């Protein structure tokens, strides 16, 4: 995913946190803000130390999330900035579980249209 598709600055993160709407499932919290002037969506990803105690684990989860976003970018509303906050429940997720749970959360936030049938439970 190109860097132009990322929310990077602290100012932008705070703007989405403070003025955005949020939805959540057990694995992810999604904050969204409509940006009609955007040519494409922008996403910020946060994986805290409670989720993975090592940088390797946190970076693996971020890599999985970015891969799902990259695969689904044509289905994502282009006029939105959103943040994906990972919860500790997602600590041991593999790529398949990340995909199912993330698509469910994105559908709840109306970032993508279709809601997957079910969310994988441990």
Curated annotation (Swiss-Prot):
GO process terms (BP): tRNA 5'-leader removal
One Pfam family hit: Ribonuclease_P
Keywords from the UniProt entry: Endonuclease, Hydrolase, Nuclease, RNA-binding, tRNA processing
Any one annotated GO CC term: ribonuclease P complex
Catalysed reactions listed for this entry: Endonucleolytic cleavage of RNA, removing 5'-extranucleotides from tRNA precursor
EC number: 3.1.26.5
Molecular functions per Gene Ontology: 3'-tRNA processing endoribonuclease activity; ribonuclease P activity; tRNA binding
Protein's UniProt keywords contain RNA-binding: yes
Subunit-structure text: Consists of a catalytic RNA component (M1 or rnpB) and a protein subunit.
Job description of the protein: RNaseP catalyzes the removal of the 5'-leader sequence from pre-tRNA to produce the mature 5'-terminus. It can also cleave other RNA substrates such as 4.5S RNA. The protein component plays an auxiliary but essential role in vivo by binding to the 5'-leader sequence and broadening the substrate specificity of the ribozyme.
HAMAP family: RNase_P (MF_00227)
Family assignment from sequence similarity: Belongs to the RnpA family.
Protein name as it appears in the record: Ribonuclease P protein component
Lineage: Bacteria, Bacillati, Bacillota, Bacilli, Lactobacillales
GN (gene name): rnpA
